[in-house]
Swiss-Prot record:
Expressed by the venom gland. CDD domains: TFP_snake_toxin (cd00206). Belongs to the three-finger toxin family. Long-chain subfamily. Type II alpha-neurotoxin sub-subfamily. It comes from the Eukaryota. Its main location: secreted. This is Long neurotoxin 5. It is found in: Secreted. Signal peptide: none annotated. Disulfide bonds join C3-C20, C14-C41, C26-C30, C45-C56, C57-C62. It comes from Naja naja. InterPro entries: Snake_3FTx, Snake_toxin-like_sf, Snake_toxin_con_site, Toxin_cobra-type. GO terms for cellular component: extracellular region.
Length: 71
């Protein structure tokens, strides 16, 4: 599977059986810069924590950089 990976936002091969993920959350600059974004691949979908949104998928390049809402 190929997933987009931050910080370069380039598509890279991930090991067999892995999933792609998009993780977004707010930090102290969220009101000015928008949500923080982490793209990558993992053996399993990361555990969701309070204040963090995680989307997982299992097809090539299914985790593009999300469109940001203007603050």
């Amino acid at each position: 599977i190929r997933c987009f990976i931050t910080p370069d936002i380039t598509s890279k091969d991930c090991p067999n059986g892995h999933v792609c993920y998009t993780k977004t959350w707010c930090d102290g600059f969220c009101s000015r810069r928008g949500e923080r974004v982490d793209l990558g691949c993992a053996a399993t979908c990361p555990t969701v924590k309070t204040g963090v949104d995680i989307q997982c998928c299992s097809t090539d390049d299914c985790d593009p950089f999300p469109t940001r809402k203007r603050p």
